Each structure stands twice: as C-alpha cells, then as structure tokens.
Regions:
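Conserved beta-strand hairpin/beta-sheet module of binuclear metal-dependent hydrolase folds
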Residues: 1-37, 148-163
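Active-site HxH/HxHxD metal-binding segment of metal-dependent hydrolases
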Residues: 35-116, 122-123
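Residue-level marker for buried hydrophobic side chains located in beta-strands
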Residues: 17-19, 48, 71, 154-156, ...
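Short N-terminal helix/helix-N-cap motif within the alpha/beta-hydrolase-1
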Residues: 27-28, 52, 57-59, 143, ...
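Soluble, non-transmembrane catalytic domains of enzymes that act on hydrophobic metabolites at membranes
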Residues: 43-49, 54-65, 126, 130, ...
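Metallo-beta-lactamase
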Residues: 24-25, 116, 123, 132-139, ...
C-alpha cells in the first residue's frame, strides 16, 4: 500500500529471481511488473523469502504455485511458514505497538514448505541462476532473516533496516531507521556491519531506500548505543 512494501527482481537471460512476494493476493501487481518486462510467472526460477512477516512471505505459496519455482528461506522462521507457530512481534516504538494490533499483520497466510532451507550461517550461491551473488543468513529482525549480496557491492537486506515514516517508503526515505519490529538490535548491527565489510555500497530494503553505506554505518552506531545504554 502507498508504495511502502518493496519486492525485487534479479533478471538475466536465464529468467529472473524474485526476492519477497508481498502481501497475500498481490500477485496481480507482480504480474503487471513482469508483463512490462516481457516476462511471465514461469520466468521466475527462484523465490527468495527474506523473513516470515506477512508483507514479505504472504504471497509465497501463490507465486510458487504460479511459477513452479523453488523457494529458499531460513530454518529459523520455518514454523511460521508452515503455520506451526503464530508470528510474534517485538515492537521498536509506538507505530509498531499500534501496527501489531492491526488485523492485516496478524492474519495467517497460506502455508508453504521452502524447498531450500538455510541453517545457521549457511550461504547459497546464485551462480547456478546466472547471478553473481549469494544468499546469506542475517538474523536479528527475525531469527530466520536472510539477505542477498550481489556483485559484492549491492545488498537486499529485507527488514534489517528501513527508511521513511510509518512502515517505511514515505518521506525521509534517505534516512535510516529501525523497522516497526525487531527481535535483536545487537544482531542487526552485527549483520549490517558484516555486509558493509564485504564492500557493499548500496543497501536495498523491504521498506524505503535504497541507502548508501555511509547512512547504514550511521544507523549501526545508533543501534550499538541503543544496546549499551
């Protein structure tokens, strides 16, 4: 809604990789973008889910069915994907506290079983899909959060970081902030630092952005102070 939720396509001659699937029933929006690029759902060769929140994983089962693509996710969030556990939310401020009571985010979505499960500090090379990049475990927002590093200078980090007001993506999109929910800010700071240490210059996220490395480093320092204060 209002451009606050981002999903990403990595495209080459072999097809494309979809990173996150949006809310349930948003497949028409994805189809519209695919058509503009002269692509169809069957051109999607892999679906990467950065974490289990409904605005990222809510349409995964439908897109998996429409595309026939494999889904990669992390074992840390598996009970939420399969519906074994109800999602819990650790609010970072007033908006998170209010938003967590809204029906949409609490609504269960269609269950699915990821085809490829990362565990611990696993990495998944995307070369087999013609992409110079890797999927890596980056816990903190949720225990099962993952990120994608591309060409060693770009990263798609889900909700490890956000920008803009409310959910993100509206006004002040150049300023980093904590997302409405975050389980472990210390882990988030460590994972963002690890990604920056790889030489990543541009960070793309689920809400707002993109952000340059300099702004992400500033946010990391704020998180460190938050933890120690």
């Amino acid at each position: 809604p209002f451009g606050m939720i981002n999903a990403f396509l990595l495209i080459n001659s072999q097809g494309c990789i979809l990173i996150d699937t949006g809310l349930p029933n948003s497949e028409k929006k994805i189809e519209t973008v695919l058509k503009k690029l002269n692509l169809t759902f069957t051109d999607i060769k892999l679906i990467i889910i950065t974490h289990a929140h409904i605005d990222h994983a809510g349409n995964a089962a439908k897109i998996k069915f429409l595309s026939g693509a494999q889904v990669i996710a992390h074992n840390g969030d598996l009970p939420y994907y399969t519906g074994e556990k109800k999602m819990h939310f650790c609010s970072t401020g007033w908006f998170g506290r209010v938003f967590s009571k809204v029906g949409v985010i609490q609504k269960p979505y269609d269950k699915f079983e990821p085809d490829i499960l990362l565990t611990s500090k696993d990495r998944f090379d995307l070369k087999r899909y013609g992409i110079d990049g890797e999927v890596m475990s980056t816990p903190g927002h949720t225990q099962g959060s993952i990120s994608v590093v591309i060409d060693n200078d770009k990263a798609i980090v889900g909700d490890l970081i956000s920008s803009g007001i409310l959910l993100g993506g509206i006004v002040r999109t150049h300023k980093a902030k904590r997302p409405p929910f975050e389980e472990n800010p210390l882990q988030v700071s460590q994972e963002l630092q690890s990604i920056a240490n790889k030489g990543v210059k541009t960070f793309f996220m689920g809400h707002g952005g993109p952000l340059p490395q300099k702004e992400v480093l500033r946010h990391i320092e704020k998180l460190k102070h938050l933890v120690t204060d």
